[in-house]
């Protein structure tokens, strides 16, 4: 099994040491080749433009595709992001690569306003991301595509953790947040019966 992870800063591991990024933890714990193709600030359109070079040409067996937050923070429409994700999935399937969709963690608006930028309506972004999440789950269920609901993992963890424990700045996960993401991936991989040893 060979896995490529394509995404934005949450896949890249912005704000933490490389070894603490969920993709690196996955790579260190599992006996498989894993390539991190996360790019800080990337949008789904950006991912689509580099999909052939960063995913297809590497000939992986599986790909985790995760993005959307940067699109919504830039004011891009939900339908455009859906279209981009559908194209990314179609391209993977055309090359016999098994796609898995990552649903990004929610934004902590209070922390993001203090530590990231005060110029973004984070509540609106979260609301659009919630619609996007439901669409992803519905689309994946109908298409028999697996997804990893990092949003749900974080919501559950935040019931008994302070947001500062899980977020560097309200947007990007801390080392603990990345550990949580790793565990979410493992849970889905186990449900898919992928070889983890």
Predicted regions mapped to residue ranges:
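Serine-esterase "nucleophile elbow" of acetyl-processing enzymes
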Residues: 1-46, 50-62
């Amino acid at each position: 099994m060979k896995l490529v992870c394509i995404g934005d800063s949450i896949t890249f591991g912005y704000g933490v040491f490389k070894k603490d990024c969920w993709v690196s933890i996955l790579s260190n714990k599992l006996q498989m080749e894993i390539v991190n193709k996360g790019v800080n600030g990337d949008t789904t359109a950006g991912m689509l433009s580099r999909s052939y070079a960063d995913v297809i040409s590497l000939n992986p067996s599986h790909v985790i595709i995760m993005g959307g937050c940067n699109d919504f923070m830039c004011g891009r429409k939900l339908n455009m992001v859906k279209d981009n994700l559908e194209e990314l999935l179609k391209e993977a399937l055309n090359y016999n690569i098994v796609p898995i969709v990552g649903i990004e963690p929610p934004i902590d608006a209070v922390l993001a306003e203090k530590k990231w930028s005060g110029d973004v309506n984070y509540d609106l972004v979260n609301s659009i991301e919630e619609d996007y999440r439901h669409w992803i789950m519905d689309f994946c269920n109908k298409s028999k595509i697996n997804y990893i609901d990092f949003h749900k993992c974080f919501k559950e963890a935040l019931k008994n953790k302070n947001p500062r424990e899980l977020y560097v700045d309200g947007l990007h996960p801390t080392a603990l947040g990345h550990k949580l993401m790793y565990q979410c991936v493992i849970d889905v991989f186990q449900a898919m019966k992928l070889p983890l040893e």
